[in-house]
């Protein structure tokens, strides 16, 4: 891994990285977020009983839309032509959580890590928004990159070193 920050130019100013000379390769990234809530709130999500509607369906669409808008939200991100975005949910009644996993893919000159992280984060925020009327104490946690592949730096899996 490089010790220098790629978004800082020689004069110390923030700048967008020039990716024009990078090879076009298939890039993939997986990210997660977790929403911890009251057990009753989780049951209302599971059985689609909240007044605002189908929480997981809306959160899925919000996460997909967020990945597509990542460059509008994070100033130095490149606008990307994503070929695939998915957002999936795992309801854990024992821990009263919704685990969100996002996946982004493209063939391009820069990675999709930020898009995957944005998808998982916005899906979590959407769950919070749709459930806050019954549970303002929810906690969004464990937002992280799980895995990425493609590009010059190769494969990364959380817990591993960059190869």
UniProtKB/Swiss-Prot annotation:
Signal peptide: none annotated. Pathway: Cofactor biosynthesis; molybdopterin biosynthesis. It comes from Cellvibrio japonicus (strain Ueda107) (Pseudomonas fluorescens subsp. cellulosa). HAMAP family: MoaC_B. Catalyzes the conversion of (8S)-3',8-cyclo-7,8-dihydroguanosine 5'-triphosphate to cyclic pyranopterin monophosphate (cPMP). This is Cyclic pyranopterin monophosphate synthase. Gene3D superfamilies: Molybdopterin cofactor biosynthesis C (MoaC) domain. PANTHER family: MOLYBDOPTERIN COFACTOR SYNTHESIS PROTEIN A (PTHR22960). It is an enzyme of class 4 (lyase). Homohexamer; trimer of dimers. It catalyses: (8S)-3',8-cyclo-7,8-dihydroguanosine 5'-triphosphate = cyclic pyranopterin phosphate + diphosphate. The keyword Coiled coil does not apply. Keywords: Lyase, Molybdenum cofactor biosynthesis. One of its GO terms (biological process) is Mo-molybdopterin cofactor biosynthetic process. Its EC number is 4.6.1.17. The active site is at 129.
